[in-house]
């Protein structure tokens, strides 16, 4: 079924920054998609086109990307008369029309907006739910509900506190369903709020960009201690484990790491990658930490490799791999990590996201689907994670509607699947394992 009309507009994301929204019309109706954007971005990501006009939205407008869709991409696609079910052909056409390595001509935010809308229209054209259409595109007969990784304590570039490491997450792996995982996560979150309030005062329970708390603590193990206390207070020490996103590229300074990077610079306090690795090993030993994302800088390959060989937990590449097949292949070859963080806007199309996921999975890696810190009410990634069977998703705390939109959609999907619903649970790293 051909596209009848493609129209893009500028809307605002959850941080009050402009982003791209696309309406695509077919005979089946209107299909709308919105593009997210990140705060801590890897230098190898596809280009998010911003206007740079300082007098408007402080330079962050996206009118150029919107115009690229309305004046060029849209008309070219309509003229080409491609079917919305041919996701790969549509994406390939847009990528070739752009012609750059990092989508800098039209902007990854323009191409992705159209790509997401096409995927939604394709599902409707086939008369199947979006998650089933995505599973078909990926060649997956199965559908798997993911373990949610709730980012409940925020630091790094996401928060105004002194904490260097960006995210401290809880994963209810011992739940028997996604719905139960949501309940456990929410209960631990509320207990955590009480623990933080009692220890640091009420103003310490204000939330960050992703709905997590941002108490003014400096020591990273203090955040882990708070999680441990909240998990026990909620009564789930056997069901909830901990994940971290360090985002270490944000505090990498001249070959060393500055764990107090939000204070005036003191090179005497910077530590080596090896020392930082020892700190992580102490976390793994003393707390139920099962996953660490971006433990080192995106170009500090040697430290990644030596660290991975000495631990048996999940080590996730985000800034390291940026959902890019070339970077993933490099990380596989160097044995730098064992899990891919999948962000659709890092690579800029649905087809390439699916390819990146399959490349990681074919090399024995886990895959975690992820939101960005600047989100919208769009729920595409909820269907994506079920269709790709990755078994794990991180899309913030159980707080703030742009985060809950995804989690609530996952609960609806589980309900729709009924007794066919499979929850990844403790097999979140390799949910397809029998």
Swiss-Prot record:
Catalytic reactions of this protein: (2R)-2-phosphoglycerate = phosphoenolpyruvate + H2O
Catalytic residues in the record: 210, 343
Presence of keyword Metal-binding: yes
Entry keyword RNA-binding: no
Cofactor(s) the protein requires to work: Mg(2+)
Enzyme class, broadest EC rank: lyase
Phosphotyrosine: residues bearing it: 236
GO biological process, one term: canonical glycolysis
Residues annotated as binding substrate: 158, 167, 293, 318, 370-373, 394
Sequence positions that bind Mg(2+): 245, 293, 318
Any Pfam family the entry gives: Enolase_N
Cellular location(s): Cytoplasm
Tissue: The alpha/alpha homodimer is expressed in embryo and in most adult tissues. The alpha/beta heterodimer and the beta/beta homodimer are found in striated muscle, and the alpha/gamma heterodimer and the gamma/gamma homodimer in neurons.
Job description of the protein: Glycolytic enzyme that catalyzes the conversion of 2-phosphoglycerate to phosphoenolpyruvate. Appears to have a function in striated muscle development and regeneration.
Disorder named in the UniProt entry: Glycogen storage disease 13: A metabolic disorder that results in exercise-induced myalgias, generalized muscle weakness and fatigability. It is characterized by increased serum creatine kinase and decreased enolase 3 activity. Dramatically reduced protein levels with focal sarcoplasmic accumulation of glycogen-beta particles are detected on ultrastructural analysis.
Protein name: Beta-enolase
Source taxonomy: Eukaryota, Metazoa, Chordata, Craniata, Vertebrata
